[in-house]
C-alpha cells in the first residue's frame, strides 16, 4: 500500500527503475491504495496538485497500475492523470460477502460523505442498512466527526467501512475513548 507515501514513494520509484535496469521488460505496480489522489486541486494558494505530479512520476517507471477503489473525486478515471494503463478492482463484493457471512444484524457506517458510494454499494450487496458520519476536515490530520441519530443503529452490529484502514482504526479508538 502507498498509505503514508512520503517515505515510500522514492524507494518505490528506485525499485521499479532497478527492475528495468536488471532486465525486466515490464514493470507493473499493484497498490491497494494510490497515494496523493485526494490532492486533485489546489486547496490553498501555492500548493502542488500532487495527484498529477505523483501520477506523472509513476507513469515514467511503471508500465501499468492495478489499485483498489481509488479516490476519484474530481477525476472520472485514473486515465485522466496516469499515462499508463490502469485497472481498478472493486472491493465491495468481497467486503459485502464477508459482512453477510460473519456479522449478525449489521449496520454499515461510512466515516464521511466521500465514503458513501462504497458504503452504499457494500450495504446493497450485503442486504444491510447503512449510515454515513459527517466529517469536518480542518486540515490533513485535523478531522472531526459527528455521529448520526444513534436510535437508527439500535440492536445492530456496527461495521465501519473505510478505504484507508489506519483512518478507520483511528476513528474507532476515538469513539471508544469518548464512550
Model region roles, listed by residue range:
Residues 1-179:
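PRPP-associated nucleotide enzymes
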Amino acid at each position: 500500500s502507498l498509505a503514508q507515501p512520503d517515505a515510500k514513494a522514492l524507494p518505490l520509484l528506485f525499485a521499479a527503475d532497478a527492475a528495468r535496469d536488471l532486465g525486466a521488460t515490464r514493470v507493473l505496480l499493484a497498490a491497494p491504495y494510490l497515494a496523493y489522489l485526494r490532492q486533485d486541486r489546489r486547496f490553498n494558494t501555492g500548493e502542488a496538485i500532487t495527484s498529477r505530479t505523483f501520477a506523472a512520476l509513476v507513469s515514467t517507471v511503471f508500465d501499468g497500475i492495478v489499485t483498489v477503489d481509488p479516490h476519484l473525486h474530481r477525476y472520472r478515471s485514473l486515465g485522466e492523470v496516469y499515462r499508463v494503463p490502469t485497472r481498478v478492482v472493486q472491493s465491495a463484493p468481497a467486503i459485502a460477502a464477508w459482512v453477510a457471512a460473519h456479522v449478525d444484524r449489521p449496520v454499515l457506517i461510512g466515516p464521511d460523505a466521500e465514503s458513501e458510494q462504497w458504503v452504499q454499494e457494500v450495504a446493497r450487496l450485503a442486504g444491510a442498512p447503512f449510515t454515513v458520519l459527517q466529517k469536518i476536515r480542518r486540515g490533513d490530520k485535523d478531522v472531526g466527526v459527528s455521529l448520526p441519530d444513534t436510535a437508527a443503529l439500535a440492536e445492530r452490529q456496527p461495521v465501519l467501512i473505510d478505504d484507508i484502514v489506519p483512518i478507520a482504526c483511528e476513528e474507532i479508538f476515538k469513539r471508544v475513548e469518548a464512550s
